Amino acid sequence: MPIDCKAKCGNRATLKRPKTGDALCKACFFAAFEAEIHHTIISSKLFRRGEKVAVAASGGKDSTVLAHVLKLLNERHDYGLDLVLLSIDEGITGYRDDSLETVKQNRDDYQMPLKILSYEELYGWTMDRIVAQIGRSNNCTFCGVFRRQALDRGAKLLGVDSIATGHNADDIAETVLMNILRGDTARLRRCTDIRTGGSEDSIPRVKPLKYSYEKEIVMYAHYKKLVYFSTECVFAPNAYRGHARAFLKDLEKVRPSVIMDIIYSGEQLRFKDTVKKPVRGICERCSFVSSQQPCKACVLLEGLNRGLPKLGIGKKSKGDRMIAKQNQELALRERANIVKNDF
C-alpha cells in the first residue's frame, strides 16, 4: 500500500531514511539531507566568507557527495567560498588510477580546479612498491601516514585556508571503536572533533559530513545519479578498520541509533589531567606538523629507503605494555619467593 511522504508535501514516499526511519519522497529526502549538512556547517562555524577550501577528492561516494553538496550549498546560501579539489595518487594499480578518472569527471561536472599529488613525486615510492617490500600486514599504516601528510603538502601548495574531508558518521564511530580497542586515549577524544588542526603551522581540517550516515550518502548519490567510484581498495581487506566496521554493522542491526550513540559518547569523554596528551610541533626534517620527532612519515620513509621497512612499526599498544609490565612484576615476585625459600 502506498505511503504518503512524512513531510506532507503531497507526494508518495519512495524511500525510508536510515537515520530517522521517516518515509520520504526523493525531493524531501534531498532537502532534509542538504539542510542537515548546512546546519552542521553553520552551527560548527566550519567556514568563513572568502576562504579557499580544498575538498579532499578520492572519487568515492563520500568525497563526490561532499563536493556536490558543498558546491550546491555555497551557491544556495552564498557562503562565499572558493572551492578546489585536491586528490592524492597513492600509486595503487587497478584502484587509484581508475578512481582518478572519476575525480577528473567531478572536476568537469562541478567546474572546480583540481590538483593531483602522487606518493611517487612526494616520497619516491608508490603503494604498489611499498607493499611489494613490506607485505600486506602493515600497508594501511604506511598509506594512512603518507596520505595525511600528502594532503597537508597539497593544501600548502594550493594556499587553502582549510581542507574538507568526506569522513561520515560511520567512519567516526568506527574510529572511536578502534581507539577504544587499541587503548589509544590520546586519539579517542580528538577523533570526534569536527575541526582539527588550525595552529599557525597547520591547515585545519573539517568534516561537514560528520553526522551523515553512510547509507544516506549512498542513497543521495544514487538518486542524484552522481558519478562516483565504488571499488574497494585492493589492500583494504587486510585493514584493522574492517573488523570495527563489521562489528558496528552487527550492532546497528540490534540498535539502529548506535552510530550516533558512539559519536556522542566520544564527544562527551573527559580525561584526567594526569593523562598525557600528545604535544604537536614541527618535524625537524620535513617541517610539517607532528606529535613526535622526527614525524611518523619521515620515520617510515627512512625505513623504506634503508631497506628496514619495519623501522617505524611495531610500537606496542598500551594493553600490550600493561601485560608486559604485569608479567615482569610477576617474574620479580616469583624470583623473590625463590630467594626467600632458599634461606
UniProtKB/Swiss-Prot annotation:
Listed GO biological process terms: protein urmylation; tRNA thio-modification; tRNA wobble position uridine thiolation; tRNA wobble uridine modification
Signal sequence region: none
Pathway involvement of the protein, from the record: tRNA modification; 5-methoxycarbonylmethyl-2-thiouridine-tRNA biosynthesis
Principal place of residence: cytoplasm
InterPro entries: CTU1-like_ATP-bd, CTU1_C, Ncs6/Tuc1/Ctu1, Rossmann-like_a/b/a_fold, TilS/TtcA_N, tRNA_thiolation_TtcA_Ctu1, UPF0021_CS
Keywords recorded for this protein, A-Z: Cytoplasm, RNA-binding, Transferase, tRNA processing, tRNA-binding
Gene Ontology cellular-component annotations: cytosol; cytosolic tRNA wobble base thiouridylase complex; mitochondrion
Source organism, top-level taxon: Eukaryota
SUPFAM superfamilies assigned to the protein according to its UniProt record, in alphabetical order: Adenine nucleotide alpha hydrolases-like
GO molecular-function term, one example from the UniProt record: tRNA binding
HAMAP family reported in the protein's UniProt record: CTU1
Function: Plays a central role in 2-thiolation of mcm(5)S(2)U at tRNA wobble positions of tRNA(Lys), tRNA(Glu) and tRNA(Gln). Directly binds tRNAs and probably acts by catalyzing adenylation of tRNAs, an intermediate required for 2-thiolation. It is unclear whether it acts as a sulfurtransferase that transfers sulfur from thiocarboxylated URM1 onto the uridine of tRNAs at wobble position.
Family: Belongs to the TtcA family. CTU1/NCS6/ATPBD3 subfamily.
Name this polypeptide is given: Cytoplasmic tRNA 2-thiolation protein 1
Organism: Drosophila virilis
